[in-house]
Amino acid sequence: MGFVKVLKTKAYFKRFQTKYRRRREGLTDYYARKRLIIQDKDKYNTPKYRLVARATNTRIIAQIVYATLKCDRVLCAADSYELKRFGVSTGLASYAAAYATGLLLARRLLKQIGLDTVYAGQTKVDGAYFNVDEDQKEKKPFKAILDAGLVRTTTGNRVFGVLKGACDGGINIPHSESRFPGYVRASDEGESSKYKPEDHKARIFGKHIDAYMKHLKGQSNEAFQKQFSKWSKTLEAAKVDSVEKLFTKVHAEIRKNPERVKSTKKNDKPKRDHKKFYPTKLTAAQRKDRVKTKFQLALSQ
């Protein structure tokens, strides 16, 4: 059979249905969203909470969101930019920063709803699978579902770093270790799949950054300064000699005080005097008097 060119006819364009704007722009996966937010029909005003994790080129954003008929509402949020006050001023889009952001979100949320003392989470980070047990306390743990958006959920993605941090922080999120760094899938030779928690722990504490810093410093000091000058300044400011010790310190500080600090920036610009530009509204009596005055002035002329 020869090649047949597909012609888009008038009927094709007449029946063509465009996708939703946010799907066309690559912002919302409505197929997944429908399954994430729809609740059982016998439950009323009981929203499903989503852990929305997004990674950009420069930062990690984590939010706890629930849907209403009108819009989505954010219950709690954390940003990797907030790690600057804990001593991390660079590498804010790394896997280690993603874990710390998830931990910050979890501790902040639980403190907000009064469950921070009930559910401490995994205080000793070892990279092993951990999820809050629903039956171990009187109060049920806060439950959320991971919303990864349109990102490819490959093994080791930073989205799962946020997930691991939130789980270790005390939020109950259904998951498995099959997408964490350190998970090896079953091979065709007959080897079964296995999970290495120590590899995941190394990523959480940024040991891979330490290893490459050491390697590059031994190769070329010029290349090291070009690649890791900001990291050197960060470690020097935090008074530690490795990225692992830095994030160990950060995790402890987050658990101590996860609350958001208000900005202390002062607005140097003076407030605009709007009364100067907009005249005050006259009352009915004042308007009548003004008309009378204008009428008498016209008669006198």
UniProtKB/Swiss-Prot annotation:
Cellular component annotations (GO), alphabetically ordered: cytosolic large ribosomal subunit; nucleus
GO biological process, one term: ribosomal large subunit assembly
Composition bias type Basic and acidic residues, residue spans: 257-271
Compartment(s): Cytoplasm; Nucleus
Keywords noted in UniProt: Cytoplasm, Nucleus, Ribonucleoprotein, Ribosomal protein, RNA-binding, rRNA-binding
Leader sequence segment: none
Gene3D superfamilies: 3.30.420.100
Residue numbers spanned by region Disordered: 257-283
Superkingdom in the source lineage: Eukaryota
Cross-referenced PANTHER family: LARGE RIBOSOMAL SUBUNIT PROTEIN UL18, RIBOSOMAL PROTEIN L5-RELATED
Function of the molecule: Component of the ribosome, a large ribonucleoprotein complex responsible for the synthesis of proteins in the cell. The small ribosomal subunit (SSU) binds messenger RNAs (mRNAs) and translates the encoded message by selecting cognate aminoacyl-transfer RNA (tRNA) molecules. The large subunit (LSU) contains the ribosomal catalytic site termed the peptidyl transferase center (PTC), which catalyzes the formation of peptide bonds, thereby polymerizing the amino acids delivered by tRNAs into a polypeptide chain.
Family in the record: Belongs to the universal ribosomal protein uL18 family.
Subunit field text: Component of the large ribosomal subunit (LSU).
Name of the protein this chain belongs to: Large ribosomal subunit protein uL18
Organism in which the protein naturally occurs: Tetrahymena thermophila (strain SB210)
Origin organism lineage: Eukaryota, Sar, Alveolata, Ciliophora, Intramacronucleata
